[in-house]
Amino acid sequence: DNILFRVETGGLFEDLPRNSQGQAIIADARNDENLMIAGIQVAFLKFHNAVVERVRTATDLDGDAAFAEARRIVTWHYQWLILHQFLPQFIGQALVNDILANGRQHYTTLVPTIPVEFQTAAYRFGHSMIRPSYRANLAGDKGEAFFGMVFDPSEFGKSDPGDMTG
């Protein structure tokens, strides 16, 4: 099916589609930088596929039209998450409310895009807040925690992996 995104599994969890060298086959290689980012990418791929199926059953759209509608819906959900979950955590609900009430202070286009200021500033700020590890799976390995090490793999196996304070 050429409008669904491929998602792979090694039998334990979903993963990004990969080539024979293990490189993710995705539009932006940065979305495979670490376990958590790759997991978010997989979640959006799966969400897109579910939306495609919903569009196909709820409308008469198929092919490129179904893909475009699914893309529009997924993009809207992503933007909703940024506005209602991400931004309030970083800039506070009061500033989000002010922007919604009084408008943004930059020129806009008719094309729905993420402003470059957000791409380069807010996401970089978010990257600086990353933890050294994330508990990634409690269901596998007889309930033992699996830590996805983001920085120092030598911390693997410790009950409380070290942080970045040195």
Spans of features found by a protein language model:
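An N-terminal structural lobe/cap that precedes and organizes the functional/catalytic core
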Residues: 1-36
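Short, well-ordered helical secondary-structure segments
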Residues: 24-27, 61, 112
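Inter-helical turn/loop segments and adjacent helix faces that build the functional surface
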Residues: 51-68
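Fold-level signature of zinc-dependent metallopeptidase catalytic domains
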Residues: 30-32, 37-39, 43-44, 50-52
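Conserved structured core elements
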Residues: 42-45, 64, 68, 72
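Extended amphipathic alpha-helical segments with heptad-repeat/coiled-coil character used for oligomerization
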Residues: 69-166
